[in-house]
Curated annotation (Swiss-Prot):
Note on cofactor: Binds 1 zinc ion per subunit.
Name of the featured protein: Formamidopyrimidine-DNA glycosylase
Quaternary structure annotation from Swiss-Prot or TrEMBL: Monomer.
Native source organism of the sequence: Legionella pneumophila (strain Paris)
Stated family: Belongs to the FPG family.
Molecular functions per Gene Ontology: 8-oxo-7,8-dihydroguanine DNA N-glycosylase activity; class I DNA-(apurinic or apyrimidinic site) endonuclease activity; damaged DNA binding; zinc ion binding
Length: 274
């Protein structure tokens, strides 16, 4: 699933082509996504100015002079900027034609994404209203996490992947951040010390910033708006490296299932706290 760096990379890629432009046509080929694409999307969007493009967590918002389009890439989706004459492929579900001869094309093979219209304040929409702070903001710090973790017996990995605690951190970047902070992913959140939270928040911020600079992580499905893969996969220390030697201590990387997700870690660098 695209995480914060992949969504931010996508936002940055489409922004120069869309911001300040006018939507001339909205073309829907398949409405059946996680939430159905509005039947009247063309009526809602035609002639609207795109005034801004922002990101909230793993969501992209197209701000128009009236209304908003909320986009989520789901498990395998991506947005591309293409010529309006480019032939659509099998999983290209929605096109927004722009008054510069280009189109924003939404592709989602597994159809877990969404492409919906919101009339009112989008930040009050149920999908956004209860999200936690952005991990790259000043609001996300060790004091905040320490306060939220009080009496939380869930694993620290599940804790930082909870979008109501902090947005945008998925399996890849949670595993990498915990490795650098030397915290076992199954450690109870309430047992993490202030010093450890200081280390963890710092590493989360650094990893996300580095991943954004590298264009995100491409393992299978993610490509940026210009069709390029993300190169942060070459910097991964533990994710996807089961049974390979740790790059720090040379012990074998192991995995443990936490909340249904395989979590990679080094048993030597990240000892479990009992």
């Amino acid at each position: 699933m695209p995480e914060l760096p992949e969504v931010e990379t996508t936002k940055q890629g489409i922004k120069p082509h869309l911001e300040g432009r006018i939507i001339t046509t909205a073309q829907v080929r398949n409405r059946k996504l996680r939430l159905p694409v509005p039947l009247n999307l063309n009526e809602l969007c035609e002639g609207k100015h795109i005034t801004a493009i922002t990101r909230r967590g793993k969501y992209i918002l197209l701000h128009m002079d009236k209304g908003y389009i909320l986009i989520h890439l789901g498990m395998s989706g991506h947005l591309r900027i293409v010529s309006q004459t480019a032939n659509p492929q099998k999983h290209d579900h929605v096109d927004l034609h722009i008054n510069n001869g280009l189109a924003l094309r939404f592709c989602d093979p597994r159809r877990f994404g969404l492409f919906i219209y919101i009339d009112e304040n989008p930040y009050q929409h149920p999908l956004l209203a209860h999200l936690g702070p952005e991990p790259l903001s000043d609001d996300f710090n060790s004091e905040y996490l320490l306060r939220k973790a009080a009496n939380k017996s869930q694993s620290i990995k599940s804790f930082i992947m909870d979008s109501q605690i902090v947005v945008g951190i998925g399996n890849i970047y949670a595993a990498e951040s915990l490795f650098l902070a030397k915290i076992h992913p199954n450690t109870s959140a309430k047992k993490i010390t202030t010093e450890e939270f200081n280390s963890l928040t710092g590493h989360i911020k650094k990893i996300l910033e580095s991943a954004i600079e590298a264009g995100g992580t491409t393992l299978r499905d993610f490509y940026s708006s210009d069709g390029k893969p993300g190169y942060f996969r070459f910097a991964l220390k533990v994710y996807g490296r089961k049974n390979l030697p740790c790059l720090v201590c040379e012990n074998k990387i192991e995995t443990v299932v936490i909340a249904g997700r395989h979590s990679a870690f080094c048993p030597h660098c990240q000892p479990i706290i009992t």
